[in-house]
């Protein structure tokens, strides 16, 4: 019984390294991209293989992130319980784990999907685990903006998996997530600013102040609203998406305005939480509209 408990705890620790909640949202957006890439239903074998491969490589990237930021995580209440921050998993163990699941993901994508998706997903891995985590995040308060492309790539990965191509429509999906990322993370950085100050990371509220950050959340929100209209503007989606996007955008703008003009930590926290719901519902609306367009 003791052995089973220890094994279960170890599995849970490795699972936590992959940041499962973040991975789930990324993979969800990738799956939506798979369905939007074809007017019919995509091949279920491709969907399953691509989902597994993208999930594995995303998990590998997040494991490297946990490794690199283990000391920073230990100084922040939000992240102090992560396995690397707690010293529950060693550096060699994390490297091996990331290498194994990342390699497995590449193998699945190459053999059961297509080389384009494998290389794009690998490039996304490098973009997040190396360029963003190691280079940009500790160096500039614009880390979220510059490094946001890697986090925005999942729908393009899904599209490439099914179509073996990346047309304009796929990049519109990437652009939506790219513009969504700064207000999403800056809302978190605002109400967690004391923790980020202890971490040593140059997050925007620390380097430029809260008022500057609040204003830029509002600016990016305006840009996001305009960007979410692109699928309808180019004929990629219809009225169902337009109506849902408009409602979601109005709520997002309300939160952003409150953060900008009537700031409290509570409203920033609510905006951060809503931004996750927002992105999920926005992509779900794209999927529903794709098959029920009128």
Curated annotation (Swiss-Prot):
Keyword Endoplasmic reticulum attributed: no
Enzyme class: transferase
Major subcellular location class: membrane
Pathway annotation: Porphyrin-containing compound metabolism; heme O biosynthesis; heme O from protoheme: step 1/1
This enzyme's EC code(s): 2.5.1.141
InterPro entries: Protohaem_IX_farnesylTrfase, UbiA_prenyltransferase, UbiA_prenylTrfase_CS, UbiA_sf
Keywords: Cell inner membrane, Cell membrane, Heme biosynthesis, Membrane, Transferase, Transmembrane, Transmembrane helix
Gene Ontology biological process terms in this record: heme O biosynthetic process
MF-aspect GO terms: protoheme IX farnesyltransferase activity
Catalytic activity: heme b + (2E,6E)-farnesyl diphosphate + H2O = Fe(II)-heme o + diphosphate
Membrane topology field: Multi-pass membrane protein
Subcellular localization, as worded in the UniProt entry: Cell inner membrane
A GO CC annotation given for this chain: plasma membrane
Gene3D superfamilies hit by this protein: UbiA prenyltransferase (1.10.357.140)
CDD domains for this protein: PT_UbiA_Cox10 (cd13957)
Residues passing through the membrane, by range: 22-42, 46-66, 89-109, 116-136, 143-163, 170-190, 211-231, 232-252, 272-292
Pfam families: UbiA
Additional notes on this entry: Carbon 2 of the heme B porphyrin ring is defined according to the Fischer nomenclature.
Known role: Converts heme B (protoheme IX) to heme O by substitution of the vinyl group on carbon 2 of heme B porphyrin ring with a hydroxyethyl farnesyl side group.
Family under the similarity heading: Belongs to the UbiA prenyltransferase family. Protoheme IX farnesyltransferase subfamily.
HAMAP family per record: CyoE_CtaB (MF_00154)
Designated name of the protein: Protoheme IX farnesyltransferase
Organism of provenance: Herminiimonas arsenicoxydans
Organism lineage string: Bacteria, Pseudomonadati, Pseudomonadota, Betaproteobacteria, Burkholderiales
Gene from which this protein is expressed: ctaB
